[in-house]
Structures are given as structure tokens and as C-alpha cells.
Amino acid sequence: MRTCFIFLGTIYFMLNAISLHAQKKPLDHSVYDGWQSLGERKISPNGQWIAYTIEVQEGDGNLVVQRFDSSYQLIFPRGYGLDFTNDSKHLLFKIKAKYADIRSARIKKVKPDEFPKDSLGIINLITLAIEKVPNVLTFKLPKDSSGVYAYHSSKSTDTLVRVLSDSVSIKKDTSKKSIPQIIEQVPDPEQKRKLSPKKKNDESESDIELDADEPGTPGASVPEGTDLVIVDYLHGIKKTYPLVSDYLWSDNGKILLLETTTAKRNTTLKPSVLIWRAAENRIDTLLVGGNDFRGFTIDKNGYQVAFLAERDSAFKSTQKFYKVWYWKNGDPSARILVDRYSKGMNINWVISQDFSPYFSKSGQRLFLGTAPAKPVRDTSLIDIDLVKLDVWHYNDEYLQPYQLRNLDQENKRSYLALVETASGNFRQLADTDMPQLMVSNEGDGHQFLGVSDKLYRKSMQWEGGTRKDIFSVDPHTGKRTLIIKALDGIPMISPNARYIYWYDMEKRHYAVRVGERNLPISTGIKTKLYDEEYDMPSEPTPYGVMRWLENDSLLFVYDRYDIWQLDPQGKKIPMNLTKGEGRKNHISYRWVNTDPAVNYLKQDQVIYLRQFNEKNKFSGFAQMNIGVPGIPESLQMGSVSVGGLVKAKQANSFLYTRERFDSSAAVYCSYDLVSGRRMSTINTQQANYNWMTAELVEWKAYDGKIATGIVYKPEDFDPKRKYPMIAYFYETLSDGLFNYLAPAPTPSRLNIPFFVSRGYIVLAPDIRYQKGYPGKAAYDYVVSGARALVKKGWVDSTKMGIQGQSWGGYQVAHIITRTTLFAAAWAGAPVANMTSAYGGIRWESGMNRQFQYEKSQSRIGATLWEKPQLYIENSPLFHLKAVKTPLVIMANDNDGAVPWYQGIEMFTAMRRLNKPVWMLNYNGEAHNLVERKNRKDIQIREQQFFDWLLKGEKPSTWLKYGVPAIEKGRNWGFETVLD
């Protein structure tokens, strides 16, 4: 009997040991860097190839290239920036330098020129040959054609020059310097450059004379250009041009525009603008000499070129005047099209150097930017004698901080103008009275949309935005016709310019300008076209516009679930295109744009929709014929989160992603979106760790409404155990039920998978607000949710914590003044005192914070002097005597959203009251942590804090004793206190 007992005991011990060995380990802080995610994703135009990047949080990722049928796969370490040629014959991509090499260079503080450089990868998708080119800055492909590409090297090779005969030939003038027009590299076996002793048949020496106004010569501070390589793989041509600083393809690939610089060792070479003609394989010179070229543009057909050039001033001049230069096919060289003296130019206005010109689709119009000339800077003034002062005036359009924050943008502000390319007629369209202009029909429209908020800017201080006057602008004359005044809404113009239309936030409808009247076109719809759950004290935002039908014949808009068809003439009653199927089943249908090049829908076009079930959070894809109203055909729907749908240009081949809370995002391919083939698998190491499950939970909140949230449980969850719990919240999070959450050092949000893996339950409750009582709403939903979980029997009511960042941080701070339920609280960037925060500045934008309380997220809905009691009631600072929960505050001294003195107010008050409180100030950090080292640091501190108070582990020294300033940078306080 004794022997049997010993034997059975041995078996039990062995089985228990095996069970323990099989247990999955919890996540720790070492896992972050290698955790993977999907990055770029593309499908070849013919639908036969896909490519995507797999990125890691810190380190080197991979580029994966696969046949659509999964029959072939290539993996390229560090590949990114991928693009297929339009004929699907090649894939080009960049290859990053190794992360370790870049990090080493940063540590050694090497010069930028000596940093490790990217390379270029080229795959021939027909032969599967692979080419790697080192030291490449960029590569470019024509948008709409194939057969050619170009890449820009970061290196300049030693070069002797000779002039190409196919350059434009202009008669020599021996009284002026003559300069070589273009140089071609001639490689020898040692990859050195030397002069060829014999000219090829298509080459001869020629010169071009300098411009008549003798342009200035750039100084040494202008970077010298580097080699540009042009490849015509259809004809086996490969040419290298040195000293290139910029380049641009025409959409059809017929021409390549090049900008070249002077050479440090050959100052007779002048900066130039050139074009390479693909058909003739030759270079033409458009312009030689100048201080600065910029804003290059080519028309859609590759027949016209325009750019800005500054050629007249000294290189270091404080005032420069740019001109618009223009070339069309057949011209011997570029000519001036517009300058500051052109007829129609406003007095004392100039061509803006900060606006890149562009052609209309037809090429008949060239759009450019102009601006008032800036006053000449007085260089006689000595900086140390200048007073540094901001003068705030009560009639300023914008507050001084807003002006200063946007100073660079304002200095670069440009006003749209156009010039007719055939006649050269110039026309100013926008100006300081009407600064915004939206063109239509790709620049060829008969009317444009003008917008002005000039009369309403002051009220942005408390409104958060501005009302707008809306104009119809005639591009032929510049005449403006007022359409609607003081609109609180969203103005738009139809693709073909037939209609100016808008959503009116106050009247809550869509309206269209028809003839001389403004016509509401959605008033016949009984369901709301605006956010039904909007709970801020301002007008609700619309669900939005889907698209116009071709010829501007119909407008499609969304309600919460369905798609509506509106007649812009108001003659046909609005039609529910999806027949109310969405609302009936709580499914929202949203169009997925699978052809970004087209800005309208065609009659009888089959469109693809993402469908999302609001009740169970399932998602998938559906399709319908836009010309046949009816129930969308569901293609796939399930307990996953789908997205990223891409369609091949020339085939019914689709690429998309699927993910779940327990499975990383994966790339899928499909021919019909009904069945899909999984193409990628990442984060296989997850199988070694105790992961998490996620489920929806409902309970009755204290305001009497049914509340919803997500409960995250450990994979090895045992309902017989009592778990510590952390509630994490912001506003509403439950729609993300199936989103995959990677373990990562966060900007200061809760690292949910990390804590769940280590034995915590996490509750993410949705919060519904009532105007004037945001703090009470947080209490009603968070506390009721926590207690509802306690009733389930597997949450320890004495070991519960709360965590939130920003708006969530404020709610954490408020909740602990209302209850002692929680044993630990963590508040990132909280507002403690609404009365002092109300008049503060959001330094990142320069905006005053008043709008946030009166109209936006803080949801008070009144000014401080109208309802001061609400500001006090909702401010944690005034109720801190009741606090018993230990609190950690993160308040960073470069926070541009919540003034960090809010954290100081809360910390110093709790310290004065002898309440347990800590504050973390990451020096120089923003509202949300940016630097990865700081994100890693805060993850460790959050774990130590919650483990101490919710798991009973020993505290670390920063919690027990703090970190004195004298030890800053030497002692981080992570060590465990052993006494």
C-alpha cells in the first residue's frame, strides 16, 4: 500500500511537472522590438504578383514578393518603398541600410554624407533576375506608362564632359562665355570616367549662350547634384547623367525632366533644366543658368513643361523674384510665361516660390501661386539690439500663439492664379479676401469653388472652427458670385463642376446651388444623415459623401448604415440605394475605392463595400450594382476585422487584410472576395506566450442605459480564480473588438496584451456622455462596468485599477474623487482644473482651449462665467480631499495639447493633502510620448506600479523613495525594494 502511494504520488508529480512545462510564458518587455506588423501592400497591375513589407518595431524588416497563385515567393531583407511597373514586368524597391549600421553612425555622430545609404532593388518578374544598385536616393516610374524608369544615386562619379549633339543648338556669341550643355558618362572597366577619344555618330560638340540677363551663379552652399540613371528596358538603353538634383517623369513616360547643378570642380558648368525624350533617346536643354529652379510640372500628354526659376538676384539676396518658365513640344527652349510684371498681376505681388504649378487635365490652363511681396529685411539692424516682443490685440483675427505657431505656413501662403497656355493671359483667382479655391474637372471646370472665413476668424477662439462665405468663381473672368454666407458646414464642388454643394451643420441637410437658388436635396429623408450618437455640445457631423455618378447626375451619401441617392436637381425623391438593409440589420455599408484614378462612379458599375455589424462587431465585404437599388450581396462576413482592400488595375484580383484579437493581420488574395487565400504569417512566436481572448460584455450603467465594453482575459483564464483588473477607457472602444493589439511600448496608453498575458483582466468600457457632466458619465460607465465584472465572480474587487491617457487621463483623475473602489490609478496628461485650463493654450496648434469646453470633447457646453459650477463640479482639483487611491500622473513639459501645469496642479494639491501621488515628466516630450526609449521606460513603470498595488509585489525604489534630481540620469529607480 505504501509502495502504491509513493508510485501514484510520483506519477502525479511528473504529470504536474509536464503540465507546468507546457504552460505558456507571459509577455515581458524584451519582446517588443521583434514584434512584427504589415506595412506597405501592393498588387501588380495584371494581378499576378503581390508585394508587401513586414516591419518590426525596432530593427530590420523584410519585403515579401509572391505570385498571386502562391507558386513563388522571394524575401528581401530591409526592402521598402515598392512599386510595380505598369506592364507588370518589373518591381522596384529600396533597400534600407542595416539598422545596426545606422544606429552606430548616429552614436558616432558621423556626417550625413557618410551615413549608410539605401540601395535599389529591381526584380524582373518575367525572368526572375534580380539586380541591386548601391547608394540610391530615389527612383521614379511614369504614372501611366511602362518601359522606362529612373533612379537617382547618392554618389557623384568623377566625370569628364562632352556635349551631346541632340541638345538644342543656339548660335555662339564669342563675347559671352560658352558652357557645355549636357555631360554623359563613359565608363571603363575600372568604373572610372574618362574622355572618349572618338565621338559616336549621334554626338557632336555644341554650346548654348547664357540668358540675356546674365543670371547669378549659386554659391558653394548649393549641394552638387549626383548621378541619375535612366533605364529603357524595352530597348536595352541605360544612360547616366551627372550633377542631377531633381527629376520628374511625364505621366505617359514620353519625357523626363532633369534639373542639374554646377560642379564644384568645374564652375563653368551652369545649373540647367533639361528634358530627356524617350522615343528619340536624346536630351534637350530648356534653360541654362540660374540661382534656383523648383516647382517642376509636366502636362498629362508630355507636351508642356513649366517650372519656377530665380536667375537675377545675388545668391545671398534677401529678396528673390521668381518667374514661371514654360516650354511646349517644338519650342527650342523654355521662355518666360509669367512674372511679377504680367498683366493682371496685383500691384506689389509676386510669383510664390512656395507653390508648385500644375496643368489642368487638358493642358490649356496652368495654375500657379502668387503672394504679396515681402518687405526687404533691414540688414543694418543688429540682432542683439532688437526687442523680442509679441503684441496681443483684442481685434486680432487670430490669437498671437496661433499666429506664431503658423508663422511659417503664413509666410508661405500662396493664392491661386491661372494662365492660359495658348494665349498667355494671366488671371488672379484667389486673394487675401478669398484665400481658398477648389478647382473642378481636374482644372478644366467652368466654375470653381471659393471659400473665405475672413469675417469669422476671431470666433475660432471659442468655436474651434470658422464659418465660411462660399463663392462660385468663374475661371474665365475671375468673377465671384456669393452662394451662401456664414456657412457652418462643409462646402464641395461636383467633379464636372455642374454643382457647388454643401452640408449645412445647422440645418442638417445637403444643399446644391441650382441656377440662382440654393436647393435642399436631402430634406425628404427621415433618417438622420448626421452622427446619431454625437454627444458633444456642437452641431453633429455628417456621415459623409460617397461619390457622384458620372456627369454629376446623382449624388450618393451615407446615413448611419445605408447609402442614399440624391438628385441634385431636386426633381426625384431621395432613394435608399441599399433598401434599408443596413439599418434593419445594424450593418453599416461603406464604399471602398478600388480605382483612385477616377473621381466618379459609372452607371451600372459594380462597387465594393466594407460591411460592419454594430452589434457583434463582425466585418466583411459586399458588392452591389450602383445602378440597381437593392440589398448588397454579402461576399464575406465574420468574427474578424477586414480592411486594406486593393484591386488590380487590369484584373479581378484583390488584396486585403484580416486580423483578430488573437491573430496578427495577414495578407489575403482573392479573385471574388468570397474565398481568400492567406499569403502571410507573422509573429509565430506568439504561440509561445500566454495570449488573450476578447469578448463583448453588457451591463446597466448608472444612468439607466445598457452599456457595452470589451473584456480581455488571459488565454489560460480560469473562472474559478480571482484576477486583478484594470479598466482602460477613452470614449468608445468596442468597435475595435476584433482588432489585433500588438505588445508594444505605447505613447502612454495601456499596453493591453502585456498586462493580460501577465494575469490581469482588462475592461474597456464605452462611455456615453451628457452635456455638462462628462465626469459623472465617466463614473457612471466605468464604475458600473467594474462592479458588473466583480459580480461574475472572477475579478478581485480589492485589486482593481484604472488607466487612461489624455481625455482618458482626465476621467481617471475625476473618478478617483468620486469613489474609493480602485486600488491604483494612472492618469496620462490629465486636466485637473477646468477653470485654469479653460483659458489656456494648446501650444501645438496655438489655439485657445475655450472651444474644447464650450463645443468639443470636454462637453461643458457653456462659458466659464455662464456656468462656473459645472467647471468646478467636473474639475478633480476641487474634490481631492476625498481621494484615497494612489495615483501616477504623466505630465510632459512639451505637451502641446494639455498644459503640463495641469499635472503640476494635481500633484502639488495631492502632495499638500498627503495623498500618495507620483508625477512623471519626460523632458521635452509631447502630449503622447514620441521617443521609443521613453515609451519603453513608461511600460516598465506602469508594470511596477500596478504589480505593486494590484498583485502585492514589492515596490521599486522610484515608487518607494522617488529619484532625487541629483541622481537624474544615473538612477532610474527600477530596483525592487527588498526591506
Segment roles from a protein language model:
Residues 676:
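Catalytic P-loop NTP-binding/switch module of NTPases
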Residues 524-533, 673, 681-799, 803-806, ...:
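Cap/lid segment of the alpha/beta-hydrolase catalytic domain
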Residues 1-24, 831, 840:
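Bacterial Sec-dependent N-terminal signal peptides
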Residues 742-979:
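Active-site-proximal cap/loop segments of hydrolase catalytic domains
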Residues 453, 612, 659, 728-732, ...:
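Glycine-rich His-Gly loop
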Residues 230, 427, 449, 668, ...:
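Hydrophobic/aromatic beta-strand patches that form the interior of the parallel beta-sheet core
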Residues 12, 21-653, 659-663, 669, ...:
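Beta-propeller folds
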Residues 263-264, 312-314, 716, 734, ...:
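Short strand->helix junction
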